[in-house]
Amino acid sequence: MSSESIAAKRRGVGGGIAFVVCGPSGAGKNSAIERVMAILPGLSFSVSYTTRARRSGEVDGRDYRYVSRQTFDELVAQGEMVEHVTYLGDAYGTPRAQIREVFSRGEDVVLNIDVKGAKRLKSCGLLDFAVIYVFLTPSSLEILGQRLRERGTETPEQIRGRLEVTRQEMEALPLFDYLVINDDLDTAVDELRAIIVAERSRVRRD
């Protein structure tokens, strides 16, 4: 049996896999995801829609798709979002069509969404693809707060708000399949890569 037919059988058993990576702002999710995608073939990043303002250095279509609230609400009404949430006044959503397109190429998809989005995705019931939930975070709120201050993109009040949200999000850990501690990026990348490799090798999903 060729490697191509073996891969096809794996797809037939479980189809594409959506790897949902959640965690607080400043946890290093983007950096870890980018590193893993540079190592592992067959992964595509799902670019979310958002109504929030673009930050310095961000690129439309790479980091997010930046749209008005009216456009976002129209996409939701048309059923174009797999999940969508509002976080600190800004809306975020995962486009359904992009996931379908990635799977049609025989690849797996990585989603960087918040805990509310993960909960909504999990509450959808039976999906036509497998979803693996990973929570990535530093080992303490003190480390997270320091990273947010060093990033310099938010006011002290906004940072306090994010830390409070993180405290609440930690209560949702039992909903996740894996926890990755990112105090050292190299270690976190190795762990995230190992998770993806293991899940791709899984024959049965209960």
Please provide the spans of the model-predicted regions.
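N-terminal phosphate/diphosphate-binding loop that engages ATP/GTP or pyrophosphate donors
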Residues: 30-80
